[in-house]
Amino acid sequence: MPQCDAYYTHLILILQLKYLIIYDIIHIMKISLETINKFHHARTQAHIDCLNYHAGLLGYHFPEHDNDKHSGTMMTGYAYINYGRYHPEFNIPETHRSLFRQMHKEHHTTQSHHLEHYSDVSEISDITLIEMVCDWFSASFEQRYLTHEDPDDLSVLKWFNTQLRNNPKYKWSQKQIDLICSTIDFLEMYANYDEVIKIWLPLLSM
């Protein structure tokens, strides 16, 4: 009988797994892949436009920012997550969450505007630091005012001071800290909420 019990237990597990796979497929099919990808492209472009709005206040423009997210496996990895962030009722299958984790790590390690790209922050150029700060502003605005993923509602400066400034993992030079803080201060002073929200609003109707 123990063998019989093991057989039925195994069979039940297989049936449960098949059910979950079928459920995920049916649920995904309710939202077309075209809809998910269209939203992802719009959201990614809004992030880039928001970043370049802030960069423009400083006299910069970063046209190549996040270009890797527009095609291939990177796009697939991010598309379902981006759609789910704005549509909480959308059930993201674990397979797509796992792919996102892989692509997120790859993006952060291969793109120079992310700290994970560097073994030593002294390698970061001043222009790339400015792109980083603008990226933080774009991400912060989205998470605080649109997706509400920042429960602490931290400003960029508070986030930098809390997470990065004194983090032993990053050995910032005083020059880098001064550049980061002066850039943050400038953007917090001159960035206009009404102008920035206009960049993101079209997403809310998609």
Can you name each region flagged by the protein language model?
Residues 1, 7-11, 15, 19-20, ...:
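Short terminal hydrophobic/aromatic SLiMs and anchors at protein ends
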Residues 1-2, 29:
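Accessible peptide chain termini
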Residues 28-206:
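Metal-dependent phosphohydrolase cores
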